[in-house]
């Protein structure tokens, strides 16, 4: 059960994120090799802000990394107005829309209060072949296009930051 989230840039927490990313890399793509996961981490970890979500036993049950960007390629820009969520990982035994939405709500509220410049847009991608994630993202974001990813077609979703915050804060906590 989801308890709380921690926002961090410490090496210890980055290591926890990396371990979870490597362990569950096949949830992004069944073809993602260990080498590709390591390359992803080496290329993106430095620019990423990390969110770890914990259960009541202080075990990591979910992780997210994001950065600010200002272009359609989602390259890092510290002054960008778009928050690009690069990855979200939820432990398989904890996977549910409720866990995702509660952690996502806490993350967006934290970002609203602590990230400057405040983003005006949130963007993320999902494998075209993953119906569960695409259905989940369509609940709160608009499909804005496709791009060729490392392992096939990815659907890009975008949403106004304040609209997303409003949507997530209407959800009840349990």
What are these regions (language model features)?
Residues 146-174:
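C-terminal "cap" of GNAT-fold acetyltransferases
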Residues 135-149:
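Conserved acetyl-CoA-binding loop of GNAT-fold acetyltransferases
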Residues 16-20, 48, 102, 106:
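Alpha-helical elements of Rossmann-like donor-binding domains used by nucleotide-donor carbohydrate transfer enzymes
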Residues 1-37:
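Short amphipathic alpha-helix that is part of the acyltransferase structural core
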């Amino acid at each position: 059960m989801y308890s709380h989230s921690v926002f961090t840039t410490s090496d210890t927490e980055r290591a926890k994120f990396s371990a979870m990313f490597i362990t569950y890399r096949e949830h992004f793509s069944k073809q993602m090799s260990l080498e590709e996961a390591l390359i992803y981490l080496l290329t993106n970890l430095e620019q990423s802000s990390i969110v770890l979500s914990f259960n009541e036993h202080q075990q990591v049950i979910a992780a997210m990394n994001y950065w600010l960007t200002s272009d359609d390629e989602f390259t890092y820009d510290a002054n960008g107005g778009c928050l690009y969520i690069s990855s979200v990982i939820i432990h398989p035994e904890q996977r549910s829309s409720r866990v995702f939405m509660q952690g996502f709500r806490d993350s967006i509220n934290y970002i609203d209060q602590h990230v400057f410049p405040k983003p005006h847009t949130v963007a993320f991608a999902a494998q075209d072949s993953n119906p569960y994630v695409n259905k989940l993202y369509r609940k709160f974001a608009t499909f804005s296009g496709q791009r060729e990813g490392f392992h096939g077609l990815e659907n890009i979703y975008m949403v106004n930051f304040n609209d997303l915050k409003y949507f997530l804060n209407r959800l009840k906590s349990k």
